[in-house]
Amino acid sequence: MPGAAVPGAAGRVAAAPCPFQLAGEEEGDRYHCGVLTVEQRRDRPAGVQLGIFFARLNAVEPVQPPLLFLAGGPGASGVYEVPLLAELLAPLRRSRDLLFFDLRGAGFSQPRIDCRATVHEGVGSTCMAALRSRGLDPMAFNTTQAAADAAELLAALGYVRADLLGVSYGTRLALELMRSHPQVVRAAVLDSTVAPEILTYELQALGDYQARVWPYADCEQNPRCRGRFGGMAGRFLALLNRLDEAPPAVLVGHVPLEASALYSLNNLVAGRPDRVALLPLIVDELDRGETATYRALLDQDLGEVPAVPARVGDASDQFLPRFELFLQSLSSEQAAAVRRELAGLPVEDPGNQALLALLAARRTPAALWQLAARMTSYERQRVLAAYGVPLALYVPHLLGDVKAIFDCQEEIPFVEPDLLRQNQSVIPLPALLPAYDFAEGISASQRSCREMGIGPAPLAFKGPVTATHPVLLLAGTQDTVTPMLWAELAAAALPNARLQRLPGYSHALLYQTGACVAELALQFLAAPTQPVAARCTAPIDYVLEPPLAVRLTGRTWLLQGWAGEAAAGSPVTALFSRGRVVGLDGCGTYAADFVVAGDRLEISDPVADNDSCTGAAQELQRAFLAALADAWQVTVRGDRMLLGTADGTLLVFVLEPDLPLEGPNWRLVALPAADEAGLPASLQIAPVTARFDQGRWLGVLGCNLYETAYAREKEQLLLGTLEPAVEMACVFPAGILEQEKRVARLLQGVTRYWIGGRELFLYGDSAAPSLVFYADP
């Protein structure tokens, strides 16, 4: 069978325990790990040997060549990510083995290059000297040698050819493998391409600019979008230039919108095609001085952000915080003794018996025993390292020091500062671009590489890869790390390449789209000459009018009544903002969480600050809060909002106009996230009030009445020094004076304000409000 592996060469491959576990599978049955021994320098076979760590997941029915996964970095561990990747690549595993390996010197491969563990400092000449004293040659750690390691691994495991899936740096390794070892590759899928020939520094700014302008240029190619908004790319650039002038062209909540913030909009929406679809609308509104959709995006009022696929924490991640809780239950002397015992456990501990014995002797909770019993050797060693055992272990999500060594050979020596400046000069927004002038930094990096004795790779390495294998290049249109431009350049040199753009997605598509990249890979590998398509390749469906969430949020709604029946009694209101709905309920105030998806509305059980009212007010409160919790559908038509409940009840609201600053009695309803963010005032220790009246500010901060002068001009607001009118040494309720000090400190830092309906936002230096008040009727 094409996917079957014959026994490897004797003595070159040794079994090793996997540093991970796969749910529902048995190690040694469905998956295996091991170490391939390779020569550090293939021209010196009697020299130092290196251990290349790998993992193999057996196919359900191996009828296809294996898939070799090549991780990013360089230096990221594909082996560590196996639990996540096994799930993402499950469709491919049905008919082919999945292979993962870590680069020489990185991940779980040994020896692992870790300068801090070696010389207690970062990458530099001291570390390189220490490595050389151990027989390690930094010049042997590069993409060319890594490609040879991959080819040897396939041969040692008995595979004739393999399909490749590379992500980010892994695409460079895949291309080098196709160039230098073409016989072992059948086809390749490249996700977020950075080919060997790409001048990454010189082309970074151009690629970044392309990604940020792409949605507006794409809108111009869409008849509906162009018909609604016109030439959006030109409008986007013109607005950026206007925002870079003074006075500011647009205010967002009385805060000037800076050009850099608009240019960075891509950072808020990348990887979310549904959010990218809003960009032309946002720019159109900002161009006309409107900010509703932009504010809704900043306030996260457009719905929840889907979770990005991520590796679930291993047993050591769960063990360590639980073990610390156990130690906190002991005296300081006992806890110190247990820590010493743990640090003294043997590094090699078959079955984790020594760790289990310590836990039993110390009578730790059963949950710790259970976690320890199922730990892999690597997970147990992570526990030991956390308590002081000096182990050079792979640290998840850190690339390690091989990246610096690779870059000294393959990137930094080839940077041409003049070309970098030339490329940046063609961009019409040089003053607004991020700091892409690497000239000074590059000179220092080139000098550092020379001092470390690491020279450039052969010039041929930087030549274009022209391999004839079938290649599918996947590029996210919003990728600013390995921009789409890089994939376009790489594809131009490959005679049998197909470039597939994923609109709205950014970097490392496999980790953003879930199984969608696996579906594209499956289609391509089955029929390399045929087009591929999946949900993640769909064009952007641009939003032409403000979505419901924008029309709903940031506004105060007054209950008129139930359909056909007017609401009697005290005012009832609702303000939807930043995932919270707050307002008056007939007796006091209430608050709840909410989520909008399409026209569907989900509201958590409201929390009221006053449940002691009686009579008609109590009936109104109960009826309203019950209906609010049962609401599931929302409609906004102009200045009217309709809430429908599951039992058919319809609540009718009308929009309240923005109140003036002076006149209303303002009550504090929200503190910063570090405090009691979003809670009703009664859930603070004591109510906080404020009133602005002809240059004088008066307010209760919990116990004492304060007053001071204030000055305002447009959106600017400054309060004088707060002084209590009559100072009382309040002691009840507990913490009331601390509340006064905290609120006073925030008030003294106020520099600007904004009013939306009955809500008053006070800002300090941050873009987020420091305090939020609500106007009592």
Describe every region a protein language model picked out.
Residues V312, E324-Q370:
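Ordered core of a single globular domain
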Residues A386-P390:
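Short linear interaction motifs
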Residues M1-A4:
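N-terminal Sec signal peptide cleavage junction
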Residues V6-E285, G289-A337, E341, I405-F406, ...:
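Gly/Pro-rich cap/lid or specificity-loop segments adjacent to the active site
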